[in-house]
Amino acid sequence: MLLADWRAAFVAMPGHKGLYGPQGTGLLLCGAEASPLLYGGTGSASRRQTMPIDLPDRLEAGTHNMPGIAGLLEGLRFVSHAGVERIAQWERRLTRRAEEGLARLPGVEVFADKTGQGQTGVLSFCVKGMDCEQVGEELARRQIAVRAGLHCAPLAHRTAGTLESGTIRISPSVFNTEGQINFFLREMREILRENTKKSV
């Protein structure tokens, strides 16, 4: 990946999403001309008031998260070995299966790329008449991990028109199976059925 190809001075990315690293890790790609905003506590040359000239020391202050770095390295190795396109195809397949199944459920609104071209392994949805946190809790009781709310992305929710309600988000990965997606859809159907009975 070349920054020049992206016409960007910096590219930042989380390590715990598609790279399968631990939470709290990430990557910051920057050109050689990048300079620190503040100086002090260099980590590798603590007696100096200024950061070292050589990269990466110039941009690395303090104590490094070595366990996180080691975990991220293993995630990168896994992705490299498994193949980015192979992982992406599987995630899209599972996401498409979840999208099609959710779209058949009454009162469920799915937020997805209608063309399917830009859809990634992340899918958000809402349930009419149910708070998204309530749906998330019901799924958690059934051993299904989702994220409910604004997902640290209020601007995306403003664009989607879900800033007030939030959404429920699923993120199928290379470690999930079609059977697990089918289980998720069955449990969603049951949650909706139970909610309908309560509201009658």
Predicted regions and their residues:
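Pyridoxal 5′-phosphate
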Residues: 1-200
